[in-house]
């Protein structure tokens, strides 16, 4: 797991964030990825606003593959 930061978010008509773009750094390399949020994550959409810190899980063999946890 690693720390990341939300850099962009897409909201639905009700204002719930449904998709995020985030960045994280591993071994000096910066990665950027996007993910659709689960229903549970959407219920806490204030936690996924741009600028918020997040925790991501990544594949150690392919660190560009990650998910928001």
PLM regions: where:
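Oxidizing extracytosolic/periplasmic lumen-facing domains
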Residues: 1-69
């Amino acid at each position: 797991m690693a720390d990341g930061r939300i850099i962009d978010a897409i909201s639905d008509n009700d204002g719930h964030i449904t998709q995020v773009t985030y960045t994280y750094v591993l071994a000096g390399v910066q990665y950027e990825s996007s993910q659709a949020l689960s229903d549970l994550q959407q219920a806490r959409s204030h936690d996924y606003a741009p600028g918020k810190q997040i925790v991501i899980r990544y594949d150690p063999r392919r660190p560009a593959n990650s998910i928001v946890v």
